[in-house]
Amino acid sequence: MVMDYLRYGMHPDVPYDASIGEEMSAEEVIELGVDVVFWQNTASETLAKQLNDAGIAAVNIAFTDYESMKKSISITADVLNTDYAREMASKFNAELDSTVKEISDITSTIKDEDKLRVLNLRNFETLRADGKNTVADTWLGICGAVNVVSEQNLEGNQYLTKEQIFEWNPDVIMSSATGDAAWAYEQSDLSTLAAVKNKTVYDNPAGIFYWNRYSTETILQLKWASKLFYPELFAEVNVEQEIKDYYKTFYGYKISDENIQQMLKVLTPVGWGE
């Protein structure tokens, strides 16, 4: 699926409204003449079996943490079966490993009592959050934060209640939805939450996909979030330059300074969809 508002012109040949939903049947996929289908959602298991039975390779690339993410990247490269794909997969996996080590070496010195307690939301509308055994739980831990959902021993995607959020009272709230931070600050019924009082509710950046979710842009999430949480420990990190380097290295794309700021503010790129 192509993000319908955050493509930043990286692949202008892809139609603005290009997307494939779960409603597609095996027959419709077969008619497209594809050789391989990559899938990751458990809701697609039946379709994947039907495609495999029809002679079309349906490859599961689901992942829940960085180790399984690296495996899915390598599997994708092997399926594409080109030297370039394998080179880029190896480069990405190495970059992820080095980023994790670099940040962990610093955050491992933070005392438990000094760690920020963070809630990572899809949005305030659904209050859908990430618990244990998720990519969000992985990057939060590496960045030296405590995932308040995991703290309750809750796994996977969770739909929370407002009462739970008040009970846990996180220091920081992250949301994947544009404008959620500004919205939260205007809600009188949320005003007693620590994150609202302290203005530490943040719209999480997004690019090709949401950085804080199941995205290879998690490399950027690690660098951005660690500096956001502990600016004094990561004062030397230049997030804007990291963004430039990342998209140039892994997408061959020279992103503009304007688009970097739009990305960091989770805004629709100028001219997108016109």
Where are the regions that the model predicts?
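Periplasmic-binding protein-like
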Residues: V37-F38, V172-S176
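Extracytoplasmic substrate-binding proteins
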Residues: T46-R128, V149-S150, D203-W272
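Alpha-helical scaffolding within the catalytic cores
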Residues: D105, Q158-Q164, Y185-S191
